[in-house]
Amino acid sequence: MDSFRKRGRRDSESLPFESENSSLGATPLSLPPSSPPPEFSDEAAEALVEEDIEDLDGEALDVEDEEGEDLFGEGMERDYQQNLELDRYDIEELDDDNDLEELDIGARRAVDARLRRRDIELDAAAGRTKPAAFLQDEDDDLDSNLGTGFTRHRHRIYDEYSPNVGALDESGELPLESIADVKADSIAEWVTLDPVRRTIAREFKNFLLEYTDENGTSVYGNRIRTLGEVNAESLMVNYAHLGESKPILAYFLANAPAPIFRIFDRVALEATLLHYPDYERIHSDIHVRITNLPTCFTLRDLRQSHLNCLVRVSGVVTRRTGLFPQLKYIRFTCTKCGATLGPFFQDSSVEVKISFCHNCSSRGPFVINSERTVYNNYQRITLQESPGTVPSGRLPRHREVILLADLVDVAKPGEEIDVTGIYRNNFDASLNTKNGFPVFATIIEANHISQLDGSGNTDDDFSLSRLTDDEEREIRALAKSPDIHNRIIASMAPSIYGHRSIKTAIAAALFGGVPKNINGKHKIRGDINVLLLGDPGTAKSQFLKYVEKTAHRAVFATGQGASAVGLTASVRKDPITNEWTLEGGALVLADKGVCLIDEFDKMNDQDRTSIHEAMEQQSISISKAGIVTTLQARCTIIAAANPIGGRYNTTIPFNQNVELTEPILSRFDILQVVKDTVNPEIDEQLANFVVSSHIRSHPAFDPNMDVLKKVPTETGIDAKPIPQDLLRKYIHFAREKVFPRLQQMDEEKISRLYSDMRRESLATGSYPITVRHLESAIRLSEAFAKMQLSEFVRPSHIDKAIQVIIDSFVNAQKMSVKRSLSRTFAKYLI
């Protein structure tokens, strides 16, 4: 060690910057301030380091032995003996020269650049910054042997910390194909980068201005012009068009809708200003509404994977809140200096808070400037699964839907709608308290809402029919069958034997008549109401259950468990906002469908009176808690009731057999009395049919069993039934596509029938015949015309309607006058 020190001193005495007149060897500090800095060599630098070490050691170095440590002593052999604990080496960590290859210049540049970025990030994280003089210049390494070629993009500082987006053009945008390669952790982060955002805006603007239909007409150019003509603020964009023209944008829209919609809305406003330069004076924003999203979910299909994605759901509106102002762009006023701060965009998930005034540098307090703050319309509705889509035995699911801007008040309770929106999560403290661990509530932020017709199709121009061309041809071919009426009647509840009159009434109710609106002022309903009254065990409830499964939209209720507000509508106080909200009942939820009420006679008189308006005017008027409104209840009502005492007494009139008032009875188009009479022949056939049904319904059923050959399978109606799936499609097609008109109607025959029925009703003391029954005859005629998909009501359809009305009227009479009435009305049945 001492020899090493001496060698270091000797080297230091011969440094090149020593002057000839120096005594002990001058250091650089002894040079004049104006002298140029001397050149340092590696040996000189090493010598200076050794001198510094010597000075720091001080007296500790003098303690060492002058001879140094003897490495060749007597214990030298022990150092080279085997030691199992220490002689263990990890092969992977050994620096083996054989496994290394010399890097080329490009690889060395990449390694150096990576190390340099690491140093910059570590310095930035530790708060250390280098002076500008020590920053490496971009030309330093070009002259060196390594030639790293490190280039700084001073005009784009964020590139050091953002993903490598690729090659940019002169305008800072990317080719459309390059943005498909997502170079970020998520699509939401990728589309927020400036180059990607500008590229998306450019491509969507080209889509709006250049997309044409098969005739070469600009689709969205015409829609933008129409938007300006009606002063609207929503631009409808078909998702199929976007997927066909710009599939990358459609993919980004489905998976990151929130940032994409902000880009689309800004581009839509720019495209609108091309046609209407001053349109911002009318609307400051244009909202892009996405229609025809290909996949439609039910509310129970939504999962965690759908969060923050664009979804499409359908359901029935059960509740709607009032209209609230929502902060959109907020401005604050500093109370100390009076400066106005903002505007700040108010997101729906994060509250805007400021803590510093740029004018007076104070930390508040700040108040909201209400005059210059921009608000947005806000409303919440509750969407519930449609009654026909809920699995049996399950409760219907519901979700809160947020309506913003011009979407408010587009749907009322009871209407079936199709919602396209963003499926979001929302913090709810009550759920955390209830479950004991963090749980988020989920909402749907609506982007587009369209009304659904009875068949589940939207009412906009972009809806697609559920029926294929082959199915429509099959339906029209079925309508040409000569016995189509009998086949439809035989297909009604095939598991129930007989009861042709009830099946005819139910078939007519499912097809319905044609609603009319006289000069837009007076509406005449087209739905047919049916009342089934009879003895226990006559399959009344089974008929209702069959209709519930067959009808496209059906709501089942019982008279004992249904109150007035449960059938019509109720007003409920929201526990959060303390606001009175409106909730629709069974009749409102069954709008454009069928409402089935079992045990109709068990209802209270007050509850039964509440449905008077719904049965005739097909609307429900509400005047409660300051809410005065009208809800739609355009539905068919099929009710079942038991007579007084349990069994129907044929010796007394109809109105004495049931506890129903005349206003209710007159609103039913068809009154069907079902009596359990003793008939040995019919009873034997019924018993055989029931046994056959049980045998065929067994899981181990064998169609080749000999016992079945002796058992009849007919339902008591001589016609071939239609498969149930085809029958449902047939009914939906007839209700939505066929609207028969009255032509060549025998007005004299109808008037004479009405006159005779009123006279006999007064004489027999039965239920009264009113003008409503005359309208019932017309509705039944239209229903039979719909069964044939006929465009006009023919005389044969009127004859069938008259037969149903006469049978309903005669069967409701006393036994003593039934035969005479049958002979009186026989002339109308020829």
UniProtKB/Swiss-Prot annotation:
SMART domains reported for this sequence: MCM (SM00350)
Start-end of C4-type zinc fingers: 334-360
Keyword Nucleotide-binding annotated: yes
The keyword Hydrolase is assigned to this record: yes
Catalytic reaction list: ATP + H2O = ADP + phosphate + H(+)
Every MCM domain range: 484-691
Covalent S-S links between cysteines: none
UniProtKB keywords: ATP-binding, Cell cycle, DNA replication, DNA-binding, Helicase, Hydrolase, Metal-binding, Nucleotide-binding, Nucleus, Zinc, Zinc-finger
Residues that bind ATP: G534, D535, P536, G537, T538, A539, K540, S541
Biological processes annotated in GO: DNA replication; DNA replication-dependent chromatin assembly; double-strand break repair via break-induced replication; mitotic DNA replication initiation; premeiotic DNA replication
Main localisation: nucleus
Catalytic activity, EC: 3.6.4.12
Subcellular location: Nucleus
Region described as Disordered: 1-45
One Pfam family per UniProt: MCM2_N
Annotated GO CC locations: chromatin; chromosome, telomeric repeat region; DNA replication preinitiation complex; heterochromatin; MCM complex; nuclear pre-replicative complex; nuclear replication fork; nucleus
Motif (Arginine finger): 666-669
Residue spans of biased composition, Pro residues class: 30-39
UniProt GO molecular function: ATP binding; ATP hydrolysis activity; DNA replication origin binding; H3-H4 histone complex chaperone activity; helicase activity; nucleosome binding; single-stranded DNA binding; zinc ion binding
Family the UniProt entry places it in: Belongs to the MCM family.
Oligomeric form and interacting partners: Component of the mcm2-7 complex. The complex forms a toroidal hexameric ring with the proposed subunit order mcm2-mcm6-mcm4-mcm7-mcm3-mcm5. The heterodimers of mcm4/mcm6 and mcm3/mcm5 interact with mcm2 and mcm7. Interacts with mcm10.
Function: Acts as a component of the mcm2-7 complex (mcm complex) which is the putative replicative helicase essential for 'once per cell cycle' DNA replication initiation and elongation in eukaryotic cells. The active ATPase sites in the mcm2-7 ring are formed through the interaction surfaces of two neighboring subunits such that a critical structure of a conserved arginine finger motif is provided in trans relative to the ATP-binding site of the Walker A box of the adjacent subunit. The six ATPase active sites, however, are likely to contribute differentially to the complex helicase activity.
Name of the protein: DNA replication licensing factor mcm2
Species in which this protein is naturally found: Schizosaccharomyces pombe (strain 972 / ATCC 24843) (Fission yeast)
Taxonomic lineage from the root: Eukaryota, Fungi, Dikarya, Ascomycota, Taphrinomycotina
